[in-house]
Amino acid sequence: MLNRFIAFFRSVFLIGLVATAFGALPARAANETAPDYALSMHGDVALPADYTHFPYTNPDAPKKGSLTVGVVGTFDSLNPFVLKSMRTTARGLYNDGEFGNMVYQTLMLRSRDEPFTLYSLLAEKVAIDPERKWVEFTLNPKAKWSDGQPVTVDDVLFTYDILTEKGRPPYNSRMSRVAKIEKTGERSVRFTFNEKSDREFPMLIAGSMPVLPKHAINRDTFGNSTLEPPIGSGPYVVASVQPGQRIVYKRNPDYWGKDLPSQRGFNNFDKISIEYYRNETSLFESFKKGILDIFIEGNPIRWEKLYDFPAVEQGKVIKDTFEKGTPADMLGFVFNTRRPIFADRRVRQALGLLFDFEWANRNLFAGQYRRTQSFWEGSQLSSVGRPADARERELLAAFPGAVREDVMNGTWHPPVTDGSGHDRVPAKKAYDLLSQAGFQFKDGMAIDPTGKPFAFEIMTRSPDEEKIALAYQRNLSRLGIAVEIHTVDDAQYQQRLQTFDYDMILGALASSLSPGNEQWLRWGSASRDVQGSFNFAGVADPAVDAMIEALLAARNRADFVSAVRALDRVLISGDYYVPLYHLPYQWVARWDRIEHPQKTPLSGYQLPTWWHTSQ
């Protein structure tokens, strides 16, 4: 279940970030203007100029066979770059958390097993100013579109123009940081940045901006949804489409980049089919029948008890457990603070005390989950259990009251209940906080300061979400809080999410050890009222803005870690999310005809590196 939440939010927006530890200085600080093959945000790059492949791939993997994967949801577009189809685009086209960039590509590709590091892809060389005021790319002369046309500097210039004019967040807003883009050679293009930019922004241009084909895109209709198979530079082309049901990709035998070091061991299936299902139950049944090749598991009860069918016993279905080295993703109930009922932080804090993790974990999840506490859970970036250091206190000094004392000194933790489902200790604390906020309790109802019964809606989009919402609803009702759970279809959910038309949702945030500009889209004041942004909670706090600025300005590891921890403390103290839980591992079941590399990178398993084994 957790994996489905994370996959949904990953699929609609994945900043080009990876995760690992950080070095002290930017790579090549003494000679950053020299063309090179890689860029690193902090620290040296791990692979030499003559590297042959990423260490988590099998360069000898066979190129054959097919992969059929199921996802929950629907789609009605093949345009992932505009607001209209932001959350209804078919999976796999670009920047997909599971499938990668099958059709569209970026100038450089991130490694999943080292610091925030990018390697050559469409651009064979990169040069960057030591102050990161400009970056210049030299395109690979072999780069071609799927129709055989060369990828040119004009395509890069066109991409900048079209995304600035008609692109969705974050593409359109990002481009305002570019002061000038110019052709500097037959295959070279330079981006010069203005005062809005920061040290991370060149990395985002390199690793997160798609390059689009000027000759194959109609500028007048680019803002529309479309089901026309696109022209891309990636390893796959769209073979067939059944809207809302299925999209099939075919490996391009003429893919220009198949021998690049950054592509060896990837893209091993001749055909990839993504099948859409209404719910996980039907998806799992299809997997059991062998219709699907893999099943990405997020339900601990199912993992523990329902893999008892014959194919498992016969060894034909294999259960794999993968360990990641990145922070746990954040899953939580999200308060929409644009709603007056959630404007008071004491109210949010009180409601956060009323989620009984111990009861839910034992009764719903076979005790497999761990409680999430931090937005960078389980990493050196987490503030939980650590008192603020001198640099953090310096950053936070201008914002008295932004961080609660227990969060500042590292003693804060979510409540641990007796697991009965009706522990009175957190309920009493919640009662006291609501009373301080002006609530009264009459006839079994919580009455807000305006004299109205305290009531709100939790919007969900699946039976699994509804199940955990029901558990929360039960605890809230004990304090007289009336909660209605409204499960809507995927299209309605996406529309309401995009326009912030909800009281509370279950929200998921992908975490990394290299947080950067995506934090503006999640928490920045400027994103609060931007439709399609990921500021689900409606955060608009000067302290948050200042901490984001600090982490982006950091030039060394110590300052970066302090800034992220300070941001973590402000977010925890703001009570914008009720943190729920996470799995300590990744679980994937596969039929034995599918194989994967032995090495798992820091970011976890990488589906684009798997292959088919049958003759």
Curated annotation (Swiss-Prot):
Signal sequence, renumbered to the chain: 1-29
A Pfam family that the UniProt record links to this protein: SBP_bac_5
Predominant subcellular localization, coarse grouping: periplasm
UniProt keyword terms in alphabetical order: Periplasm, Signal, Transport
UniProt key word Transport: yes
Domain of life the protein comes from: Bacteria
InterPro entries reported in the protein's UniProt record: Peptide/Ni-bd (IPR030678), SBP_5 (IPR039424), SBP_5_dom (IPR000914)
Gene Ontology process terms (BP): microcin transport; peptide transport
Compartment(s) of residence: Periplasm
CDD domains: MbnE-like
Statement: the UniProt record of this protein carries the keyword Signal: yes
MF-aspect GO terms: peptide transmembrane transporter activity
One cellular-component annotation, GO: ATP-binding cassette (ABC) transporter complex
Family from the record: Belongs to the bacterial solute-binding protein 5 family.
PANTHER family reported in the protein's UniProt record: ABC TRANSPORTER PERIPLASMIC BINDING PROTEIN, PERIPLASMIC BINDING COMPONENT OF ABC TRANSPORTER
Protein name: Putative binding protein BRA0576/BS1330_II0571
Organism: Brucella suis biovar 1 (strain 1330)
